[in-house]
UniProtKB/Swiss-Prot annotation:
Name of the protein this chain belongs to: Brevinin-2Ej
Coiled-coil ranges from the UniProt annotation: none
Keywords: Amphibian defense peptide, Antibiotic, Antimicrobial, Cytolysis, Disulfide bond, Hemolysis, Secreted
Biological-process GO terms, alphabetical: defense response to bacterium; killing of cells of another organism
Pfam families: Antimicrobial_2 (PF08023)
Disulfides per UniProt: 24-30
Natural source organism: Pelophylax ridibundus (Marsh frog)
Family: Belongs to the frog skin active peptide (FSAP) family. Brevinin subfamily.
One GO cellular component term noted in the UniProt record for this chain: extracellular region
Amino acid sequence: GIFLDKLKNFAKGVAQSLLNKASCKLSGQC
């Protein structure tokens, strides 16, 4: 339902920001 979709979008956003943080730390460009 709608709640599940919101949850999925939220999880995607969190995962994306974690990936961005991890990759910027790895490349040393934070």
